[in-house]
Amino acid sequence: TIGIITNLGGAHDEGFKNWDEKAKEKLRLFENAQDLIYCRDFLPLQNALTKKTHYQQLNTFSWSKKLPADLMVGKLDKGEVDTIIQAVYKNDFIKITIPFIDDASIENCITCWATLLHLGYTNDWVNKRMKSLAPIAMRLELKEGLNHCSVINDYYNSDFGSLEIALDFMVQQKQQPNKTII
């Protein structure tokens, strides 16, 4: 069994005293997993992994933009419609191109990249398939409004992390020169 921790941001913080408690609780979901894929940049998770001896049986595969990891992400080059992600893996410089420019999709693609490398797929194989990814339906909806307006509806969440995602999505929209947040 492979466990994948995608993101432990501010969403769903209710019920936890702090991020350390949240990280420990999320790790409990993977107590019986053989492998764990995660981002080392979320320090409460990294700390929880190193403190608990019963996680030592886990084969971990980490990725990071800041810390030493199995997949060290270096440069992100965002274009108009795609992003080139460069990294170091097993002392080799590798890269992939993904058809997304928003931060949430980039992070999700890096996690998928790490998982596929951990499973033994070649970077060429991964890159070819990443280029053909299609966006999935998200909670953010872009609708045509009245008087030449575009409306972005985020009906799912109202936490700070969700607001950041919605604002990032808004900045990418080029339909109208002016933007209003309600």
Predicted regions and their residues:
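Active-site beta-alpha connecting loops in nucleotide-dependent enzymes
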Residues: 136-138, 155-182
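Acidic, Mg2+-coordinating active-site environments of NTP-dependent enzymes
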Residues: 2-150, 177-178
